[in-house]
């Protein structure tokens, strides 16, 4: 018997992926400021593209830092 695991997205239905939603974006970057891959976060490919775009926009506009010092 094959058992498939039902994956749930870490992004809830009411959450909007936007460069202004900094709390959501911080969940998907490392302490060093790198964007986490989707195999670790469990988001869909479409959500990963939206997250990457929003994180990059937030960095340019100054909502997120490019590098995090230790």
UniProtKB/Swiss-Prot annotation:
InterPro entries, per the entry:
Ribosomal_bS18, Ribosomal_bS18_sf
User: Which GO BP terms, alphabetically?
Assistant: translation
- Protein's UniProt keywords contain Glycosyltransferase: no
Task: Please provide one cellular component term from the Gene Ontology annotations of this protein.
Answer: chloroplast
Q: Mainly localized where?
A: plastid
The protein's assembly and partners: Part of the 30S ribosomal subunit.
Question: Which family does the record claim for this protein?
Answer: Belongs to the bacterial ribosomal protein bS18 family.
**Protein name per the record:** Small ribosomal subunit protein bS18c
């Amino acid at each position: 018997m094959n058992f498939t695991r039902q994956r749930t997205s870490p992004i809830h239905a009411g959450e909007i992926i936007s460069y202004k939603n900094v709390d959501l974006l911080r969940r998907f970057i490392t302490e060093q400021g790198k964007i986490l891959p989707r195999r670790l976060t469990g988001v869909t490919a479409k959500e990963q593209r939206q997250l990457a775009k929003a994180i990059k926009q937030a960095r340019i506009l100054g909502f997120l830092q490019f590098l995090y010092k230790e």
